[in-house]
Amino acid sequence: MPRRRVLAALLPSLVLAVLLPGLVAPAAAEHEIFYRFTVLGYVKDARGKPVAEATVQVVRDKTGFSYLGATDARGLFVVLTRLGDESVGEALTVRQGTTERRIAVAFDPTNHTDERGTRVDFEGARAMEHAAWFRSTLLNVVGVTTRH
């Protein structure tokens, strides 16, 4: 009899353990798809040579939360941030060393197919946003510009 009571007491926990992963996974996947904003670009020295292992910081000005990335041997960095549809127009500060660039988040909040992001390049003490180059750079780096 005590064994049945133990099993009866454990049954709700076992059901939750089996069902909970299935309930949580879709939410995580949806969050990944609709809340990603990528900041990528290149870091070069004043002579135009790539800077490897440089740290790049992207700060969400509204909250102060920051995201970090580092350059590879080509000077390329890719920083993934979490910004939802409501974040259009929000300010981000992209910083490498003492050089920074403040940008406004821009994307079509109704488009949940194309990757969202911008390109910011650092050369010497200058930082320049090249939003129009984002898709072509992403295609060269990753090979896709749409979400699956």
Question: What role is predicted for each listed range?
Answer:
Residues 1-8, 21:
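Twin-arginine (Tat) signal peptide motif
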Residues 10-22:
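Bacterial N-terminal signal peptides
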Residues 23-47, 61, 131-148:
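Beta-strand-rich domain onsets/edges
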Residues 50-52:
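Short acidic/proline- and small/hydrophobic-mixed sequence motifs that coincide with surface turns
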Residues 54-59:
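Hydrophobic beta-strand segments
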Residues 62-80:
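Short, acidic Ser/Thr/Gly-rich low-complexity loop/linker segments typical of extracellular
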Residues 78-89:
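Short Pro-Gly-centered beta-turn/loop motif in secreted/extracellular proteins
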Residues 100-109:
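Edge beta-strands of extracellular beta-sandwich domains
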